[in-house]
Curated annotation (Swiss-Prot):
GO cellular component, as recorded: cytosol; nucleoplasm; plasma membrane; Z disc
Molecular function GO terms recorded: ATPase activator activity; protein-folding chaperone binding; unfolded protein binding
Domain of life: Eukaryota
Subcellular locations according to the entry: Cytoplasm; Cell membrane; Cytoplasm, Myofibril, Sarcomere, Z line
Residue positions where Phosphoserine is found in the record: S122, S148
Lineage, top ranks: Eukaryota, Metazoa, Chordata, Craniata, Vertebrata
InterPro entries noted in UniProt: DnaJ_C (IPR002939), DnaJ_domain (IPR001623), DnaJ_domain_CS (IPR018253), DnaJ_subfamily_B (IPR051339), HSP40/DnaJ_pept-bd (IPR008971), J_dom_sf (IPR036869)
Protein name: DnaJ homolog subfamily B member 4
Primary location group: cytoplasm
Gene that encodes the chain: Dnajb4
UniProt entry tagged with the keyword Glycoprotein: no
Keywords on record: Cell membrane, Chaperone, Cytoplasm, Membrane, Phosphoprotein
């Protein structure tokens, strides 16, 4: 004789999906080992979970209604949709079913071990109706606020911010970064934890500006009483040996002598794509002077087919000493003001 899942949950065969949920909620709370210390509680808790797993699934329930437990587990119920025979085996962890039903956390942990108001202990708790009413909890597992109508929501932990350093070459071409994070995850029992590593993939788009944020929602540590934090990476430019960044423009500083600043010179200016641009400077280089090469900067974030400019600044090197004769020559040929 197979198991009577309807009898286990205390419902009849015509029960609706909502009836199944209510029955499981009631029986699971009644026989949960953290509350019920009787020797039979663990086995009853497991039976209730298995009954719910079957009756809450339309496919399993249909096969069970026609062929019973033996037919469900023995493959008498047709195919699995891929040409194979459908067979059901209970996974054996009623705590996983309980945690999934109540949203991944154990609602008992905040009140088990206490005596209830009015002198009742947990063994005498009333299960019919709303089983959470004695604890200030609503049917969906959220804490009740006596001064409000709706359930109060769990709060999310503050975001966890990480600085992500990228080179100008990576911003110029775009790249993929893979960041390994470690976080705590709740086990199916909703109480204990495990450590888990995860690789987060970040697609760095061409031209992204410093300060750009990449958010991975709810990838932080899991806790029973809060929503996991978002993991946020913030783009930070690495220091470059040749260039500085000015928005989508690239700034290159050319070092020249005083004679070159006054008499002119020829330069080879490096670019982000590895080339050198020949540049002839014929004007007198004055303080703060810049030369602009259009279209040789970084891609625009919103239109990566277009680029900013390459800006050339000049760092004029003055001599430490100069002879008296040279001073006299300069005095004769340079204007006084």
């Amino acid at each position: 004789m197979g198991k009577d899942y309807y009898h286990i949950l205390g419902i009849d065969k015509g029960a609706t999906d909502e009836d199944v949920k209510k029955a499981y909620r009631k029986q699971a709370l009644k026989f949960h080992p953290d509350k019920n210390k009787s020797p039979q509680a663990e086995e009853k808790f497991k039976e209730v979970a298995e009954a719910y797993e079957v009756l809450s699934d339309p496919k399993k329930r249909e096969i069970y209604d026609q062929f019973g437990e033996e037919g469900l587990k023995g493959g008498a119920g047709g195919t699995d949709g891929q040409g194979g025979t459908f067979r059901y085996t209970f996974h054996g962890d009623p705590h996983a079913t309980f945690a999934a039903f109540f949203g991944g956390s154990n609602p008992f942990e905040i009140f088990f071990g206490r005596r209830m108001g009015g002198g009742r202990d947990s063994e005498e708790m009333e299960i019919d109706g709303d089983p959470f009413s004695a604890f200030g909890f609503s049917m969906n597992g959220y804490p009740r606020d006596r001064n409000s109508v709706g359930p109060s929501r769990l709060k999310q932990d503050p975001p966890i911010i990480h600085e992500l350093k990228v080179s100008l070459e990576e911003i110029y071409s775009g790249c993929t970064k893979r960041m390994k994070i470690s976080r705590k995850r709740l086990n199916p029992d909703g109480r204990s934890y495990r450590s888990e590593d995860k690789i987060l993939t970040i697609e760095i788009k061409k031209g992204w500006k410093e300060g750009t944020k990449i958010t991975f929602p709810r990838e932080g540590d899991e806790t029973p009483n809060s929503i996991p934090a978002d993991i946020v990476f913030v783009i930070k430019d690495k220091e470059h040996p040749k260039f500085k960044r000015d928005g989508s423009n690239i700034v290159y500083t050319a070092k020249i002598s005083l004679r070159e600043a006054l008499c002119g010179c020829s330069l080879n200016v490096p670019t982000m794509d590895g080339r050198n641009l020949p540049m002839s400077v014929t004007d007198i280089v004055k303080p703060g002077m810049r030369r602009r090469v259009i279209g040789y900067g970084l891609p625009f974030p919103k239109n990566p087919d277009q680029r900013g400019d390459l800006l050339i600044e000049f760092d004029v090197s003055f001599p430490d000493v100069i002879s008296a004769a040279s001073k006299e020559i300069l005095r004769k040929h340079l204007p006084a003001s």
